[in-house]
Amino acid sequence: AHWMLGIAFVAVILPLVWLTVRSSPAELGIEAESAGESVSESEELQERYWTIAEILRQRTFWVVVLSFLPLVTAFGSIQQHLRPYAETLGVDSMQTAFLISVFATIMILAKLFFGRMADRFDHRGLFGLSLLACAVAVLGLLTSPTYSMLMVLSGLLGFSAGGFLPLLGAIVASRFGVASFGSVMGLLGPFLAASAFGPMIFSTLFQLHGNYNLALWVALAVLIPGAVAMVFLPKR
């Protein structure tokens, strides 16, 4: 089954990538500017190379860290514990597997949605939408929901998770430019990797209390500083 899924994935994704990805302005029918044309401030930003020290001194960099780290920690922790949480509600393994499928499917669709919307709308509002979906899902999980509601909540978590990479990439590219995109993303990595402690904290709290209630309240509280930090993100 895994081989068949892998082959199907390659058969569908590779042709789409081949047809849609373009590597140069010429392939998109965009003419290169002549040497005499003026360069706007936005274009200068896109071509600027930021040093590591300059990146770390930028308020925007730390706003991104303090905004995305809580969100990734919250939905990542719940994602890792979705199966054992469902088992505490009496959900069997087959039903749990379907919940994970719902999460993954909605996450894929959400990536397309957030990627498209990031080109048109304020990134702060889109981040707020992603964070709100996660917060609503956490509140729902605190109510010991029915299986039908669990499917809805899994979809909300997937929607929230789907906004992570598209919004992170859009914010970095629009605030630091494409020339230093890799440098900024690379520097963000170690800070955002701290979210890996989230599932461990969830496990510890579950072992101490015998349920996920306190862990979920902690996840909800963690989202608050993320929402506050995003307010300070400069407009693009």
Regions found by a protein language model. Give the residues of each.
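Structural signature of the two symmetry-related core transmembrane helices
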Residues: 125-139
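Extracytoplasmic gate region of multi-pass secondary transporters
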Residues: 53-116, 202
